[in-house]
Amino acid sequence: MAGPARADALKDEIAPTGKLRVAIAISPAGGAFWSTRTEAGGYAGVPVDLGREMAAQLGVGVEYVAHQNSGQIVDAAAKGSWDITFLPKDPERETKMLFGPIYEVADATYIVKAGSTATDFQTLDQPGVKVAAVNNTTTMRGAIAHLKNAKVTGYQTYDEIFGLLNNGEVDAFALSRDQLNAMARKIPGTRVLGETFKQTVTAVAVPLNHPLALAFATAFMTEAISNGTLRKAYDNNGLKDTPIRAKTQ
């Protein structure tokens, strides 16, 4: 298959509705994976910019399909409600979708509430300590594996956990360091612990049995990392000081 026939086959597979449906997850802080709602009623974020650029290359329109967290995006993978996404990858998710290149490596750690006496992982991991995580995410699974005594509870949204931490109803929140640093600036007295319990890798992904879509997404992301498209998306979304980390250490 070559030329126009291959291009048509790709569009049929990657954008069956005539638009590229990009699955995104919403949080107030944004970041390399999370997107935000704009005052005008649209969306902003690194995945938003990458999805728009990808649709332009395909010559189709773009439509964003908003979710509360990455676990919901994974659950929707088999339902045919989205065509492309950018989300944290782990072995469990690799059974439910096809992943292309990694474009972000994030360090997962914990933020502790104002007044907490925990200074490191050892003093945090005590019986009776309540740790929140976003439900059904790679970070939540990592925190459950990491903490032997503290109890990890999953919540649907970042907003809900923000409120619980702000009110002192949970002792800590597991998430990526860049997100937690942003949260610490908004909740006086909270602290982000210095250690890292897991490196979370974020990558482009397509539903299972979409080989043409995966090949296109892989080529697109490889080029985006090398030609400045990804850097521009970071810079446009408040991540000017964040280096591109496309490989684990």
Residue ranges and their predicted role:
Residues A9, T138-T153, V192-L193, T222-Q249:
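Ligand-binding clefts/hinges and TM-proximal coupling segments of bilobed small-molecule sensing domains
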Residues V48, E63-D75, T119, T153-N167, ...:
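Short helix-initiation/N-cap motifs at beta->coil->alpha
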Residues A7-P88, N227:
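Extracytoplasmic small-molecule ligand-binding "clamshell" domains
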Residues R52, A56, G61-D125, R191-G194:
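Acidic, polar ligand-binding/catalytic clefts
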